[in-house]
Each structure stands twice: as C-alpha cells, then as structure tokens.
Amino acid sequence: MIITIAFASCKKGDTGPAGPNGATGATGNANVQSLTFNIDSTQWVADSAGLQWGATYTLPAATNVSGGVFLYVQDDNNWAALPHVDYGITLEFNYDPATKIVEVQSADARASVMIPNPPSMTFKVVIIPPAIARQNPNVNMGNYREVKAAFNLSN
C-alpha cells in the first residue's frame, strides 16, 4: 500500500537537462593478467645427471593466454625477471599456450656442475595482450615495478 502511494504521488513532467560528466577514471588493465604461484622445494625434479632441475605450474583455466608471458621470481623483497642468474645458478622458463603450462628450469651456468635441489620459490606471471603491449612500447618488461605501474597491477 505504501508503494502504491509513493508511485501515485509522482507526476509526469519534462525531463531535466543532463548532469555534468563525471571525472575521468584511472586507466584500466582489464586485459592484463597477473597471478602469483609457489613452487615448493619438493616439486623440483632433477634430470638424470643432476645438472638441471625443473618444475611445472599449470595456469588456471580462466587465464587468457594470448599475448606476451613474463615471469618474475621473488628475490628478497623484489621481483626479478626470468631468465635470472643468481650466484651462478640460472633460472629460466618455457611457456606452452596450448596446455597453459609454465615450466621453470634451474641449472648451473657452467652446464657441467651438479647443483643442489632448489628451495621453495614464489613466482609471478604477467600476461599482456599484444595490443596493450604496443600501447606501452617504452615499458622495461625486465623491471617488475615499471610493469606494475604501467599496467596498473594491484599486486
């Protein structure tokens, strides 16, 4: 009954002028994806000679895989782009868009030296569509802070 009275008390009249435009919002990043994942020390598998270790991570099914794939490893409080060399140990990665599998490899730069099992590590993957990357040609993709700022990444 109260609703009926509220609608009945409204009068049809002329439409007023449009209000002012709102402020311009921040540049979005809807098409740039970023996620963090861990590889535990128990997930690393050595090759038969013990010269190289590998581990895999499968991206979530909802991940859009078109574009550039950039991988960073947490190094103290910073993110270092792969490939990355630390104390003679090289970290590099391969990405297969068909399976959405990121494979991380760790090996001694001298290629003939056995290395110990890598520790647990935290990685960040950033996927940037080609059109978005072309709009930002001066971004140093090897510098995560620059990537984060340019593409408005929250993490």
Where are these regions (language model features)?
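Sec-dependent N-terminal signal peptides
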Residues: M1-T4
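Collagen/collagen-like triple-helix recognition
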Residues: G13-S34
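Extracellular attachment/recognition segments
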Residues: I39-P118, N155
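C-terminal motif of bacterial Sec signal peptides marking the signal peptidase cleavage site
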Residues: A6-S9
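C-terminal partner/receptor-binding element of secreted or periplasmic proteins
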Residues: P119-N155
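Disulfide-bonded cysteine-rich modules in secreted/extracellular proteins
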Residues: N29-T42, R134-N138
